[in-house]
């Protein structure tokens, strides 16, 4: 009995700390310090949720920028099935998939240069990457400009406005969030 009392006390104390106090503290701090991120980094358009900034979406229409291919298994950009393709660089299946993606992109973007940016044909490690390089966005600019009947310079300006550079710069490369860029295109034509 003398050993049971401290054991029960510790179980109750740790349950209180880890089950109530710690979650309340971290939630309160997150809401105070990072409210946008703590609530899912949601991107809104006219009061409606259009997506979450850190999760990519599938865009197939000619008047929208396309992101990186998704490696999620059942449907593109499914956050519940996040994974990479796990295909080695020497795997013939990866070579075939990339070749098919290059052919499809060249067919959809006949006015673009011959060199297809690598991030448009390879999936990210998570399969959910929402960003592409500015070069990949510029590569698609002619198609977007033609489909939306906009001057190419307007499309390039939108790409520049939606390009983010990490601070400090040595922590990564400039990137463009595809969903944010497509929402900016929609807002421009309202």
From Swiss-Prot:
Entries under InterPro entries matching the protein: KdpC (IPR003820)
Gene Ontology MF terms: ATP binding; P-type potassium transmembrane transporter activity
Compositionally biased residues, Polar residues: 69-88
Main location: membrane
Localization terms from the record: Cell inner membrane
Keyword Transcription regulation: no
Transmembrane segments: 6-26
A GO CC term attached to the entry: plasma membrane
Renumbered residue ranges of the record's region Disordered: 67-88
Role summary: Part of the high-affinity ATP-driven potassium transport (or Kdp) system, which catalyzes the hydrolysis of ATP coupled with the electrogenic transport of potassium into the cytoplasm. This subunit acts as a catalytic chaperone that increases the ATP-binding affinity of the ATP-hydrolyzing subunit KdpB by the formation of a transient KdpB/KdpC/ATP ternary complex.
PANTHER family associated with the record: POTASSIUM-TRANSPORTING ATPASE C CHAIN, POTASSIUM-TRANSPORTING ATPASE KDPC SUBUNIT
Name of this protein: Potassium-transporting ATPase KdpC subunit
Gene (name only): kdpC
